[in-house]
Amino acid sequence: MALNLRKNHQILKIINDALIDLPAPSNISTWWNFGSLLGICLITQIVTGLLLAMHYTADTNLAFSSVAHMCRDVQFGWLIRNLHANGASFFFICIYLHIGRGLYYGSYLNKETWNVGVILLLTLMATAFVGYVLPWGQMSFWGATVITNLFSAIPYIGQTLVEWAWGGFSVDNPTLTRFFALHFLLPFVIVGLTLVHLTFLHETGSNNPLGIPSDCDKIPFHPYYTIKDILGFVLMLSLLVSLALFSPNLLGDPENFTPANPLVTPPHIKPEWYFLFAYAILRSIPNKLGGVLALAASILVLFLTPLLHTSKLRSMTFRPLSQILFWTLVANVLILTWVGSQPVEHPFIIIGQLASFTYFTIILVLFPLAAALENKLLKL
């Protein structure tokens, strides 16, 4: 009998075990689509980014003009740029929904997968930040100045660290050059981490909405989840193309259409929308080092979630108190996002401080307490 190449060839076997014959729970919902959507986002960003890099010039005198030239004179350059800029937004929408799914259904109990995922989030944030600097508009320049300056809050080595990152005494040509190099490199680091993420995931298998073992009822990934993922791809890419064609600048800052000028500070420096919640937490603490620590903690707190799981049930499906807290946390993050886009004045300062306090309280205190209470109420 002839060997089945798909199951015996060294390389095809890996693909087969990950995408075709992978045993998957029979009841995973659309919330499990976002992992594959993130993969498509990554591929889209690498392809469009590579095409943009072919026309971009990483020099302070030419960067802004090279981006304008791309949009005017390169075949479909405007489309490639708009897909790349808005693709970043979709990347973050998908990753936040993916993390939300993980928190709700207790997927963080696959500790290795979860920890690699948090590292992936941090790498993605770094990539998006250095990428935003490249067009060398006003918000690019001032965003780079403000955020890199935060490292100067680190005691003793802070100022040296910042000047080392800048390659001089201010954000200038060396900074832009190294940011371009990093922006080119980091997506490939993300690809590597994604493979590690998947390797750990396939050790344990996927979680499911009930949060119970699903070994007794598994179905092959292909054709069931391949077709389901393709539907997700079509829907997300349709939305991305629609945004890029109809309203490409909806999520951008008009300030970035002005070339960078170190002598003119924009009236309100703010990052892209997907960083606003963390920016609001940073701003809500009146001390520089305290703000930087809170900013770091807002993401690093995700590493603690597996340790703070006190419930005897994995998922929140049967835990109404935790559900209320979860949706309060979601609303809270949306409030932080809105506050981050507002000027630093009353009442936004106090709203931001309350929302920041609530963010950490829900994750670090209320989630474990509610879960322990539910154990009692459900007599577990």
From Swiss-Prot:
One of its GO terms (molecular function) is metal ion binding. Heme b b566 binds at H98, H197. It is found in: Mitochondrion inner membrane. Disulfide bonds: none annotated. The chain crosses the membrane at residues 34-54, 78-99, 114-134, 179-199, 227-247, 289-309, 321-341, 348-368. One of its GO terms (biological process) is mitochondrial electron transport, ubiquinol to cytochrome c. Its cofactor is heme b. Keywords: Electron transport, Heme, Iron, Membrane, Metal-binding, Mitochondrion, Mitochondrion inner membrane, Respiratory chain, Transmembrane, Transmembrane helix, Transport, Ubiquinone. Binds 2 heme b groups non-covalently. A ubiquinone binds at H202. GO terms for cellular component: mitochondrial inner membrane; respiratory chain complex III. PROSITE patterns: CYTB_CTER, CYTB_NTER. It is a multi-pass membrane protein. Heme b b562 binds at H84, H183. Its main location: mitochondrion. PANTHER family: CYTOCHROME B. Belongs to the cytochrome b family. The cytochrome bc1 complex contains 11 subunits: 3 respiratory subunits (MT-CYB, CYC1 and UQCRFS1), 2 core proteins (UQCRC1 and UQCRC2) and 6 low-molecular weight proteins (UQCRH/QCR6, UQCRB/QCR7, UQCRQ/QCR8, UQCR10/QCR9, UQCR11/QCR10 and a cleavage product of UQCRFS1). This cytochrome bc1 complex then forms a dimer. Heme 1 (or BL or b562) is low-potential and absorbs at about 562 nm, and heme 2 (or BH or b566) is high-potential and absorbs at about 566 nm. Component of the ubiquinol-cytochrome c reductase complex (complex III or cytochrome b-c1 complex) that is part of the mitochondrial respiratory chain. The b-c1 complex mediates electron transfer from ubiquinol to cytochrome c. Contributes to the generation of a proton gradient across the mitochondrial membrane that is then used for ATP synthesis. This is Cytochrome b. It comes from Oreothlypis gutturalis (Flame-throated warbler). The lineage of its organism: Eukaryota, Metazoa, Chordata, Craniata, Vertebrata. The gene is MT-CYB.
